[in-house]
Amino acid sequence: MSITPARTRFAPSPTGHLHLGGARTALYAYLLARQTAGKFILRIEDTDVKRTVAGAEQEIMDGLRWLGLEYDEGPDIGGAFGPYRQTERRDIYAAHASRLVQSGHAYPCFCTPERLTQMREAQQARKEAPRYDGLCRKLTPEDSAKRIAAGERHVIRFKMPHEGSTIAHDHIRGDISVENKNFDDAVVLKSDGLPTYHLAAMVDDHEMQITHVLRSSEWLGTFPLHVNIVRAFGWDEPIWTHLSVFLKPSGKGKMSKREAAEAIKDGHSIFVKDLLELGFTPEGVNNWCGLMGWGVPEDDVMNLTEMIQRFSIDHLTPSPAAINFAKLDHFNGTHIRLLPTEDLVARIKPFFTRAGLVAEDAMLTQIVPLLRERMVTLDDALELAGFFFRESVSPNPSDLIAKGLDAPKSAEIARRVYQILVGQPDLSHAGAEPALRAYVEESGLNVNQVFGIVRVAVTGQKVSPPLFESMEIIGREKVLARLDAAAMALTKLS
């Protein structure tokens, strides 16, 4: 374990929902910071104003907190290295862009959008890769200064070396060498004064004293550019770690919007907000996504504290990871079973409230032990136990007919069970079950036939928590009323 406190960051753009890849990046950055007694920073990279989505920033912050990834510095809590929104750091980027120009590592570019379009079309006609042709790179500083003084609109481009190669080191991939001739002179400051990612992220990481940059492998293509920008300033490089990408469940390519929509129909999602609403737990989500790309056994069950103790960037793997929703179900169900009863009660209660049911804590506390082993998601509690809180149930009449029997015989059984239970002083487990088992034995019926009718009559479901424990919690009055209603429904079918 490293003894040097790490300063890590999660730097999303507020252009959409917090997704699985972002959540894993944040998780790894959080784990490394906590393990080394360092700091975890949230920075909002909102310079792409046109694509910024209202409410996305708040959703990111809410999602991180739901996952338990509390950040030490950020836009809503401040810190020593703020502001933490890039649109609020415009002057900082302008000053750094000016430094690059003055040192000869960048230059103003006055090319109009029309000229750039014509240039690219000509390159494509020649079957060349579209790239800036360096026209303004040839301008003298004096010429550029005159045009700027005249108010001519311009951007700032980074002057990539044209000779040799750039060797950049990634912590899990080793040295990456790329010939410089393959790179364009990228825009680092736009004409509106806002930076591009290439400048802003490098400046912010330095100014915020970030020691470890964990980000998606999608940035590998511009990794040499970023390294050159850092070196142009003469700064020490952070430890770069490019994380593996997530593939769709088939392992072939990234999940499309259509496939993400299909996953929702099956009760899964790649978006944190959806996972919360679908009843997944932060413990299950962290465990699941954390192990995708982390070289530890894929069945290891860990909470955040255990993950902090075991995490190491040395164990991260560069290989793409296929999303496995069955694993999510496994981990989520496991963590539900590990939750203390009081905690689980608090987590499932909102699902009953949302369905318009008044679920009292005392009754939920009785019910939770009956549900825990059957639950995969928190909202399973509503499906499994909604009948406890309804005045009545409305089973499908055909479900009341026992296997191998007809409606008249099933109605007869329902009436007889009603009569037996009316004669019981209470419907406790200890009182009701022996009485009904005695009836089964003397009638010569199959226990599954009798108990099946009772289960559907009382719970409205073919599958439910343990029957007699459920009857005791529901209470004598409701149980008898539901049996009576079932007998009448079966009689109508006769």
Question: Where in this protein do the model-derived segments appear?
Answer:
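N-terminal Rossmann-like or analogous alpha/beta NTP/dinucleotide-binding catalytic cores
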Residues: 2-125, 221-232, 284
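Glycine- and acidic
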Residues: 8-14, 42-46, 208-213, 269-272, ...
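Structural motif
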Residues: 20, 275-283, 318-324, 358-367, ...
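Generic, well-ordered alpha-helical scaffold segments in large soluble proteins
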Residues: 63, 103, 229-232, 278, ...
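Conserved phosphate-binding loops in nucleotide/dinucleotide-binding enzymes
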Residues: 83-87, 189-190, 208-219, 247-287, ...
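Active-site cores that bind ATP or allylic diphosphates and position pyrophosphate for catalysis
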Residues: 107-108, 112-262, 271, 296
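Small-residue-rich helix-loop
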Residues: 341-443
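Charged substrate- and nucleic-acid-binding regions of tRNA-handling and nucleotidyl-transfer enzymes
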Residues: 429-490
